[in-house]
Each structure stands twice: as C-alpha cells, then as structure tokens.
Amino acid sequence: MEKKKMSLPVQIVLALILGIVVGLIFYFIGKPEITTNYFKPFGTIFVNLLKFIVVPVVLLSMIDGIISMGDMKKVGSVGWKTVAYFLVTTAAACVIGLVFANLFNNAGWFPTLALEDGAVWDKATSANFMDTLVAIFPSNMWKSFTDANMLQVIVIALMFGGGILAAGEKGKLAKDLVSTLYAVIERVMAFIIALSPIGVFTMMAWVVATQGPEILGSLAVVLGCAYLGYIVHAVLCYSFSAKAFAGISPFTFFEKASPAMIFAFTSTSSAATIPLSKECADELGAESDVSSFVIPLGATINMDGTAIYQCVATIFLATCCGMTLTLGQMVTIVVTATLASIGTAGTPGAGMIMLAMVLEAMNIPVDMIMIIYGIDRLFDMGRTCLNITGDISCACCVTEWESKKAAQTAK
C-alpha cells in the first residue's frame, strides 16, 4: 500500500509550529545567535527566490489572462468591477478596524506605551497619491522589472496584452510564446513553493529566538484586536459576498481557499501566493481568464488587511499619546486609509507607509510607529492572508457578474 504524501499546507503548518518551538529553545538557552548565523540564511534564500519569481509571475499571468479573454471590452469590464470590489471592501475593512479598536480601547484593554529613546521613523519613505499616479507609468521597462515595481509591471502587462489582442492573427506567435513561458514559470513557481516549509521553519525559528516570548508581551492585545478584525472581515465581507454573488457557501469557500491562505500567512507575500490563489479561485468556480487577471491585480492593489491594521494601530498609538479621536477624525481615517491603499499599492513596505500617512493626517507623531514596528511581521502574516482571501472572493464574484452580463447580452 502506497504511503500518502503529506499535503503542502500541512507541511507548512508543522514547519511553523516546529520553528516556534525551536526558536523558544534557542531563546531560553541564551543562544539566539545560532539561528541568526545558521537558520536565517536559509530563510533569506527562500525569500530571495520568492522575490525573483514575482515579476515574471505577475507579468505573464496578467498577459495570459488578457489574451484568454479575447476582447478588450471584457478586460475593461472585469477591471472596473475588480477595482470597485476592492474599494468597497477596503472601506468596510476600515470601519471594522475602527469598531474593534474603539471597543478594545474603551474597555481599557489597550496598553499605554512610550516610544523608546532614539527610535525614529524615516518619513522620507512616505509617498503621496499624485506621485504614485505619475510613477505607475514606466519610462524604462527593464527598470520596472529590476526594481520589481508591481504597478508598472501591471501597466506593462495591460499594454502588451492589449497590443497582442489588437494585432489579431499577426499576434498568434506572441500568444503562443506567452502561454509557453507562463507554463514554464508555473513549474518554476511550484518548485519554489515546495521549499516553503524550509523557509517558514528557519524564519520563524530566527524571529522567535531573537525576540522571545515578549515579541507579543504588552502588544498582544493590539495584535489580538487586529486579528479579530481580520477574521470578522473575512467572514462578513468575503465569504458572505461569495455566497451572495457566486452562490458559494462560507464553509466551502474557506475550505477550498485554505491552501492559499495558509501559504500567504506563512510567506507574508501576496505576489508569491498568486499561483495558489488562482488555483483555489478556479476550484471555487472562477473562470480561468478572469482569475488570471483579478488575482495578480488584487495581489498588488487589494490591501484590506493593511486597512484594518492601520485603523487599529492609529487608535492604539493615539492612546499612547494620550489623544482621544473624534468621530470626524475617524471618518477621516476611513477616507485617508482607503485612498492611501491606492496611493501606496505595490510599494515595498506599503503597510508602514499607509500608517504614516494616516498618522500625519491625525497629527499623531509619525515616530510612534516604532512602538509596533518590532512585531510588524506578526501583523503582516494575518493581513497578507486576509488580502489574498479577498482576491479569491473577488475572482469568484466577478466571474458570476460577467456570466450574468453575458447571459443578458445573449437574450
């Protein structure tokens, strides 16, 4: 009898648990430098491989999706529906984040912490919306690739995909080339993803060994508040919208989306999760051409998890400063956070940049970010998981909307 192979999601979860245990052991024996010298390098190799494959995956999957649609009108239709879905859910995420943050704060559960001496946030990393709008149009295609500027990569994919469709029969060779290259990239990505248990184990062991149990400490309540927001948003917005618009039960939705959710949680990379997210979306009934377009786009612009995080963090940091925010200021947070999610889309460290924008809008010292900066990876695991869950839900909903539109047109 052939022994059944352990599934990748199970391997990743076991690697996560084992990494925490090993990390705690090295922390308590006072040898965290062992994980820094001998564990972290392997985790870094895994992260480098993820970064290496992100650009070709996004570029080729989007071009392939556009070509598969066969009509630029459908591309436009799918595009605006996708962006609208993400804007609505991002606004909802902000409201959920604020509700839970205020509940926790009014209950006196948020600790009042002080900024450590010498801790300074580099404001130079902030960017405004208009700067980003100009920057999404590339002046040098190769620089966009080498800098991994994902918004520029998406624009390049839209232009080449549209150009191939417009070329008609003359573009057949280009279509075949894209399909072939995408098939190869999928195989390479599968190989890299297969290494994820090693990457997860080594990185978690290093983080826990160097930070210790106090990586949570007094910030555990803030972390718990954010994760409660993540869970409620996933259930209320994503699973319910999948049920209402695509006829998928919440249980089925989470069951079939779980492989991508687990991988995103441990890798903290939406872009690296694209192949798994697409596979999960297709299994839930999304059309392949729609998911090929929606998933890469969502991996770049869907930042619902980040929106919840920054609302919780803003209320918490305001409390640390002794400030009490008014209802009007909270409405400003919702608007600022929603617009910031567009303005910083595809920017490395976007979560922190968005938070800096919101804090500046609230006149809260931006340097206060440094209070929670140390455990940002723990916040990031949850928000990345939530973001890709939204991508999958969106692909299913847009597929259903396009199907209904096609049915009405056919009448």
Model-identified regions with their sequence ranges:
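Transmembrane helix boundary and interhelical junction motifs in multipass membrane proteins
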Residues: 54-58, 196-199, 269-277, 307-312, ...
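Membrane-water interface of transmembrane alpha-helices in multipass transporters/channels
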Residues: 31-38, 76, 213-221, 247-258, ...
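Residue-level signature of catalytic and energy-coupling elements of molecular machines
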Residues: 7, 46, 75, 145, ...
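Helix-loop-helix junctions within the multi-pass membrane cores of secondary transporters/permeases
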Residues: 259-341, 395, 405-411
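Juxtamembrane helix-boundary/capping and inter-helix hinge elements in multi-pass membrane proteins
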Residues: 67-74, 109, 167-172, 180, ...
